[in-house]
């Protein structure tokens, strides 16, 4: 199958399926806050300026999807915090890429609002996608999409 054959829509595509679950604005902002250590409902509501009913429904959905665990931290009154699961933590790269894109193409005159400091070396990090086989940076120009084992071409409508 030629590369150009993959340029049309195809059934079950991973990006589309993922965006169906986490592509909504508030969901991505809740994830960002969680990556930066915010776990409690009230702090999420204050930091984001999100309506409380909207926050409740998004958190409920994120728990149902397995991206957060709802964990009690107080019994009187009963209160819960929201902790990222492994599946939730694995979305970190997506948030960082969006942050980097915003810094590059929607810059603020005073510079980036958030910088990431790497714990191991103590320097500001500039995260990149790296090939685990050769160590080269991965870009849209040096990879080729190929059908994977789950590929199913979308049938054209008659």
From Swiss-Prot:
Keyword field: DNA-binding, Transcription, Transcription regulation
Pfam families in the record: HxlR
Source domain of life: Bacteria
Molecular functions (GO terms): DNA binding
Keyword Nucleotidyltransferase among record annotations: no
InterPro entries: ArsR-like_HTH, HTH_HxlR, WH-like_DNA-bd_sf, WH_DNA-bd_sf
HTH hxlR-type domain location: 13-110
The keyword DNA-binding belongs to this UniProt entry's keyword annotation: yes
Official protein name in the record: Uncharacterized HTH-type transcriptional regulator MT3179
Species per Swiss-Prot/TrEMBL record: Mycobacterium tuberculosis (strain CDC 1551 / Oshkosh)
């Amino acid at each position: 199958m030629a590369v150009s054959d993959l340029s049309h829509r195809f059934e079950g595509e991973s990006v589309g399926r993922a965006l169906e679950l986490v592509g909504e604005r508030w969901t991505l902002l809740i994830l960002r806050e969680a990556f930066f250590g915010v776990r409690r409902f009230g702090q999420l509501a204050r930091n984001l300026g999100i309506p409380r009913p909207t926050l409740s429904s998004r958190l409920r959905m994120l728990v149902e999807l397995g991206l957060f665990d709802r964990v009690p931290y107080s019994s009187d009154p009963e209160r819960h915090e929201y902790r990222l699961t492994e599946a939730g933590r694995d979305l970190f790269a997506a948030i960082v890429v969006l942050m980097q894109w915003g810094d590059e193409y929607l810059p603020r005159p005073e510079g980036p609002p958030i910088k990431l400091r790497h714990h191991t070396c103590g320097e500001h990090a500039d995260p990149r996608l790296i090939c685990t086989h050769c160590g080269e940076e991965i870009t849209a120009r040096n990879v080729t999409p190929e059908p994977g084992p789950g590929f199913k071409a979308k049938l054209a409508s008659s």
